[in-house]
């Protein structure tokens, strides 16, 4: 991870804590899959992908969350829920951190769990 990414994840975690979320894990890994932030609020497990950009010159940060990235996040979330035997609804959010003033945008319920045929 780079310094900018870590700073953005720190900003996102601080923001979530201020908003009443309980941070359960950061940079949780399952093989090659990673969850940036795992949080809980109101009985909902929230899986957060953080995207940090210096500027929007190459598009919005959230546009960098590809279908393949979503699949890896969902698989990591599945591993997390199974490992810790979590029995609560799961929501997937994206938090973007943009620019030198580190403007935060919290996209709640950013994507739904896709179903793949194997």
Residue ranges and their predicted role:
Residues 57-90:
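Mid-chain, well-packed structural core segment of small domains
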Residues 83-118:
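Domain-level recognition of nuclease-like catalytic cores that cleave nucleotide substrates
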Residues 16, 35-56, 60-61, 65, ...:
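Conserved catalytic cores of phosphodiester-cleaving nucleases, focusing on short active-site segments
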Residues 30-33, 101:
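Short acidic/glycine-enriched loop/turn segments that link adjacent beta-strands
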């Amino acid at each position: 991870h780079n310094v900018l990414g870590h700073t953005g994840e720190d900003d996102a975690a601080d923001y979530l804590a201020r908003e009443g979320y309980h941070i359960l894990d950061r940079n949780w890994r399952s093989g090659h899959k990673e969850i940036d932030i795992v949080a809980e609020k109101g009985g909902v497990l929230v899986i957060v992908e953080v995207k940090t950009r210096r500027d929007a010159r190459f598009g919005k940060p959230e546009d960098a969350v590809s279908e393949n990235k979503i699949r890896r996040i969902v698989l990591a979330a599945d591993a997390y829920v199974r490992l810790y035997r979590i029995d609560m609804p799961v929501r997937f959010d994206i938090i973007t951190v943009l620019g030198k003033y580190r403007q935060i945008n919290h996209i709640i319920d950013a994507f739904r769990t896709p179903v793949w045929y194997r």
